[in-house]
Amino acid sequence: MATYLDFEQKIKNIQDEIESSIVKGDSHAKEILERELKKEVERVYSNLSDYQKLQLARHPDRPYAMDYIKLILKDAYEIHGDRHFSDDGAIVAFLGYIEGEKVIVIGEEKGRGTKNKLARNFGMPNPEGYRKALRIAKLAERFEIPLLMLIDTPGAYPGIGAEERGQSEAIAKNLQEFSQLKIPTVSVVIGEGGSGGALAIGVADRLAMMRYSVFSVISPEGCAAILWNDPSKIESATKAMKITPDELKKANLIDDIIEEPEIGAHRDKEGAAKSLVNYFLKSLEEIRGEEHYLQKRFDRLMSYGSFTQSA
């Protein structure tokens, strides 16, 4: 059963009326309602606040990494473990083909249903997850296979065990190693890009965001609690933090924005997957055509945080 957010309620009501008209066999009413639905979708999605975009990024029906992998990857073979401690369920990795192109996909997976969410730790990787990602990225480099990374995490797991096993070191090591991989790499934020948990698989030749995704150094709830000592000020925090694709593109922190279907990825997973595939293949062609893509990757990383100040 589909989940609707508060600002999507009118859309739900119209869709319910369309279904009712189909049952009654009233094709004329159906046509009128479909036109009304199109107008309402355009009205709602063209006037979203930053907080509403955050809600969409966290939408329970939004496609997760495993959903995209099932839709885009052929002959998929899962790769497990970090060869040091364990196999972290929050990080998934598959070898397969995207439209005939051999590729390795690494993703952060939140899971669906109570049992699966617990197994995936709600998409919050432990250090062994990041070490697993690095091991598989080095494997991709060894066999000259391009890498697609799907970011979707509220953040790296902050538990005592994770800290004892070197959470910060694992993230830092990934930043260092991923910046030097001698293969084309593409990272896409598909939902939430939470702080270091996202950065650990976010260093790439291309960093893009799906239209209704977010990327931030801390959750808006955490920001509101720290700045105003009031977690209820989440809407103000979301706006102030500038976590949407448009704001991050304006700041040159991401390369591209991948458009989603008009009704959002949570209503059209196949359409969103098609947009993701098109972007990945286009980016791959561009990167392969660049003479010094490693240097370009380095230069872009070094440009982060730089600014000019006028007198």
UniProtKB/Swiss-Prot annotation:
Single GO cellular component term: acetyl-CoA carboxylase complex
UniProt entry keywords in alphabetical sequence: ATP-binding, Cytoplasm, Fatty acid biosynthesis, Fatty acid metabolism, Lipid biosynthesis, Lipid metabolism, Nucleotide-binding, Transferase
SUPFAM superfamilies per record: ClpP/crotonase (SSF52096)
UniProt-listed Enzyme Commission number(s): 2.1.3.15
Gene Ontology molecular function, alphabetical: acetyl-CoA carboxylase activity; ATP binding; carboxyl- or carbamoyltransferase activity
Entry-linked PROSITE patterns: COA_CT_CTER (PS50989)
Record keyword Cytoplasm present: yes
Pathway(s): Lipid metabolism; malonyl-CoA biosynthesis; malonyl-CoA from acetyl-CoA: step 1/1
Reactions listed under catalytic activity: N(6)-carboxybiotinyl-L-lysyl-[protein] + acetyl-CoA = N(6)-biotinyl-L-lysyl-[protein] + malonyl-CoA
Compartments it resides in: Cytoplasm
GO biological process: fatty acid biosynthetic process; malonyl-CoA biosynthetic process
Origin superkingdom: Bacteria
Domain CoA carboxyltransferase C-terminal: 36-286
Family from the record: Belongs to the AccA family.
Its job: Component of the acetyl coenzyme A carboxylase (ACC) complex. First, biotin carboxylase catalyzes the carboxylation of biotin on its carrier protein (BCCP) and then the CO(2) group is transferred by the carboxyltransferase to acetyl-CoA to form malonyl-CoA.
HAMAP family: AcetylCoA_CT_alpha
Subunit composition and interactions: Acetyl-CoA carboxylase is a heterohexamer composed of biotin carboxyl carrier protein (AccB), biotin carboxylase (AccC) and two subunits each of ACCase subunit alpha (AccA) and ACCase subunit beta (AccD).
Protein name as it appears in the record: Acetyl-coenzyme A carboxylase carboxyl transferase subunit alpha
Species this chain originates from: Wolinella succinogenes (strain ATCC 29543 / DSM 1740 / CCUG 13145 / JCM 31913 / LMG 7466 / NCTC 11488 / FDC 602W) (Vibrio succinogenes)
Lineage, broadest ranks: Bacteria, Pseudomonadati, Campylobacterota, Epsilonproteobacteria, Campylobacterales
GN (gene name): accA
